[in-house]
Amino acid sequence: MAGNTIGQLFRVTTFGESHGLALGCIVDGVPPGIPLTEADLQHDLDRRRPGTSRYTTQRREPDQVKILSGVFEGVTTGTSIGLLIENTDQRSQDYSAIKDVFRPGHADYTYEQKYGLRDYRGGGRSSARETAMRVAAGAIAKKYLAEKFGIEIRGCLTQMGDIPLEIKDWSQVEQNPFFCPDPDKIDALDELMRALKKEGDSIGAKVTVVASGVPAGLGEPVFDRLDADIAHALMSINAVKGVEIGDGFDVVALRGSQNRDEITKDGFQSNHAGGILGGISSGQQIIAHMALKPTSSITVPGRTINRFGEEVEMITKGRHDPCVGIRAVPIAEAMLAIVLMDHLLRQRAQNADVKTHIPRW
């Protein structure tokens, strides 16, 4: 299976399955001399891990990360960093009934078509369990970006179902189980989740991720545009069906006189572009949004077929998230951090000596 690696200079390769012995990743390209401990990675892993609230899957995984290599006496050595998380709460028997059945809306059918077989236990490699390693690797990138460049990356839920959420107060995001920046909507979200659990159904969501303090000049002009790489990274997250940069699809209704981000001696007057112009960062906040579909792992009966082509009725058993968008927030932060760190290292490698007299704000 190819496609397990992201990045050029900062490279992250993950491995493992939902019900395997462990998950792991190799992180290449981390500069030497950076203070790094397992505790630095654990905070974001705890934000993502299952079983932390009644609104997410009740699979209880401690997600304790182990640093296997690349760190000596508390600092990075510049060599490959190996990370490992053991799986401890698998219930593979929950999936025995779907051994020969394709769950509608899942990767069961496509994996079988591609490989001729599949690991049916929790989706195997296609499970969002894999994203734990992305979060661990992303925590390294977030630490480097914050300490070396003052870059802050934050994410939040900005819509669940038909409930829009305004970014009113970033300080509230970590104070509720929804990563919600709009405290006035917490009760509505709680009511929706209770209804979904009662119905055995699920709902989609929108997640917004913002990077502040990103210097101008990151990104390449054509195929490796910064926004293209961000979109690629976010689209690689399980259940993501759409990505927007800045105003995204809303620009369709704007005129050029409205959409252009005018510049004065005091800086940009707007940020419809989401901090990226011509595939290169402008120095403004980088803003991206991603839409996540409602999970198909629900107890509402649905039609499908088995491996023998016979039509059957499907009811998903096991422990699942009614809204996968909730735990996707730290994953989105991690993927944005991975892309930004990769492009910072690439910019430093090629253009470290470039000096301009153009104002920067």
UniProtKB/Swiss-Prot annotation:
FMN binds at residues 125-127, 238-239, 278, 293-297, 319. PROSITE patterns: CHORISMATE_SYNTHASE_1, CHORISMATE_SYNTHASE_2, CHORISMATE_SYNTHASE_3. GO terms for biological process: amino acid biosynthetic process; aromatic amino acid family biosynthetic process; chorismate biosynthetic process. NADP(+) binds at residues 48, 54. Keywords: Amino-acid biosynthesis, Aromatic amino acid biosynthesis, FAD, Flavoprotein, FMN, Lyase, NADP. This reaction introduces a second double bond into the aromatic ring system. This is Chorismate synthase. It comes from Escherichia coli O139:H28 (strain E24377A / ETEC). The lineage of its organism: Bacteria, Pseudomonadati, Pseudomonadota, Gammaproteobacteria, Enterobacterales.
